[in-house]
């Protein structure tokens, strides 16, 4: 089968975030709903013909801040679930990450590993990894990241180095 690609992805989301009472300095949470919209895109790989590939994801995460004598270390766990999605019936995504400031520098190092398990066509799943160094300067957020994937489609050249500049307001 083939896909009709629109070339666009629009994401809509809503949720809540907060800190666990009495542990505000150490433990926080986040939860919500994401809607992935692919205007004009349909999946031609289904037995009954084309269907819309837009999907909803429900997510929750916990973050732990561990103070040490040198620097604080942040550890996070994320879980997302979608009852339907791009060429699949169900999928879940789990991610564990760590982040810490490099002592006596303006830099932060972070890394994460995520696992996608799904009932996709051919039952494929994969693990993704990311390592990032970031800083803030001149009113902007700067980051250099390396991303790789193992498992599904791992034989393709999907290692990436990404340089990003952003602003928050």
PLM regions: where:
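Glycine- and aromatic-enriched membrane insertion/assembly motifs of diderm outer-membrane
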Residues: 1-31, 35, 167-169
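Sequence/structural signature of outer-membrane beta-barrel proteins
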Residues: 1-5, 21, 34-45, 67, ...
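Transmembrane beta-barrel outer-membrane domains
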Residues: 3-9, 49-57, 87-93, 122-126, ...
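Membrane-embedded beta-strand positions in outer-membrane beta-barrel channels/transporters
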Residues: 11-13, 57-61, 95-97, 130-132, ...
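Membrane-embedded beta-strand positions of outer-membrane beta-barrel proteins
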Residues: 14, 29-33, 60, 73-77, ...
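Short loop/turn motifs that connect adjacent beta-strands in outer-membrane beta-barrel proteins
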Residues: 19-28, 65-73, 101-109, 136-139
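Hydrophobic, well-structured mid-protein blocks that either form specific transmembrane helices
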Residues: 28-92
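Outer-membrane beta-barrel "beta-signal"
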Residues: 131, 135-137, 156-169
């Amino acid at each position: 089968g083939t896909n009709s690609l629109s070339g666009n992805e629009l994401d809509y989301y809503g949720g809540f975030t907060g800190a666990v009472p009495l542990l505000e300095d150490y433990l926080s949470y986040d939860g919500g709903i994401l809607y992935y919209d692919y205007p004009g895109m349909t999946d031609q790989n289904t037995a009954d013909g084309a269907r819309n590939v837009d999907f909803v994801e429900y997510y929750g995460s916990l973050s732990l801040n561990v103070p040490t004598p040198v620097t604080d270390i942040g550890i996070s766990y994320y879980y997302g679930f979608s009852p339907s999605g791009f060429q699949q019936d169900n999928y879940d995504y789990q991610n564990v990450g760590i982040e810490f400031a490099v002592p006596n520098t303006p830099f932060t190092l972070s890394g994460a590993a995520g696992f996608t398990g799904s009932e996709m066509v051919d039952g494929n799943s994969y693990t993704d990894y990311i390592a990032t160094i970031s800083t803030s300067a001149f009113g902007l957020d700067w980051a250099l990241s390396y991303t790789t994937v193992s498992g599904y489609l791992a034989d393709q050249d999907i290692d990436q180095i990404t340089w990003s500049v952003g602003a928050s307001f």
